[in-house]
Amino acid sequence: MTNIHNAQTTNTPNGSSPLGGTRGGLKVGILGAAGYTGGELIRLLLNHPEVEIVFANSESNAGNLFSDVHEGLLGETEQCFTAEMPFDKVDVVFFCFGHGKSEAFLKEHSIPANVKIIDLAQDFRIKGNHDYVYGLPEIHREEIAKCQHLANPGCFATCIQLGLLPLAQAGLLTKDIAVNAITGSTGAGQKPGATTHFSWRNNNLSVYKLFTHQHLHEICQTLNELKPATAPHVVDTLDEGFEAEGITVDFIPYRGDFARGIFCTEVVTLEKQTLIAPSDSPKGEGDRPDGNTSPLGEDGKGLEGLDIVALYKTFY
């Protein structure tokens, strides 16, 4: 959600919004608004002074208050979900569908060409036969402000990339990268499953999608986009028939016994004794100047940001 929020609040000339509306008048529609992603998006937009939610679509909850589904919104608004999708009345529409459903929706429905689309699923994150901009503001801020179609990055992908991008940009990623990351249960979506029940998740930790998580595609894509031509290629091991020459991101995701947030550890080997100062990194969201050696998982819950801490060990 950081990426959406940052894109909307970027200053632009003549009092206009980077998404195409005017200050105090950006009209927004939301599809798939009853899920966890839709609920968090509604919370952010309700508190945004430049946004009006024109409709939030959910056929199964049409007529129900937002707070009937997203209880944390009780008292914040009296708006209801709708079955209608009046695209001609909005400047931008958010897709909060499950993965794979955005592309299918666009094949079956017509959205006016002047309406901007922000897709929160993974359908358009990988470059291909489309014009969607990958919505990581630390590297694509100007493109985001100008684009018509935006693909919001994945949760793991955002966390992992922001730690690695300064090193990639400096050409320092020359060895395989080890990543371990723990995610909360809401990352699995609202629909209950065997691995999301409290009785299974509480006081438990488990590995899933070992070295095969789908976010590897977008991580490798961005690292290769930023690295100098002389730096090793980052191999996307999920691609069929990939060539092994280059370096890999060895990513092990874990299910944690908490609801929200991601805690990530990235281990890289640097051939040069070089440290990247926060000011040298892509336009990011700061460092941790208080001297703490580790961020806390609870620190970032409900916030549009993250902590990055760099620890290093010198081998002689």
Language-model-detected regions and their locations in the chain:
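Glycine-biased, low-complexity coil/linker segments
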Residues: 20-24, 240-241, 284-286, 297-301
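Residue-level hotspots at or immediately adjacent to binding/recognition sites across diverse folds
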Residues: 14, 118, 290
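Charged docking surfaces used in two-component/phosphorelay signaling
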Residues: 187-234, 239-273, 303-316
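Low-complexity intrinsically disordered segments
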Residues: 6-9, 19, 227, 234, ...
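Intrinsic-disorder-associated, low-complexity terminal segments enriched in Asp/Asn/His/Tyr and depleted
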Residues: 11, 236, 280, 287-292, ...
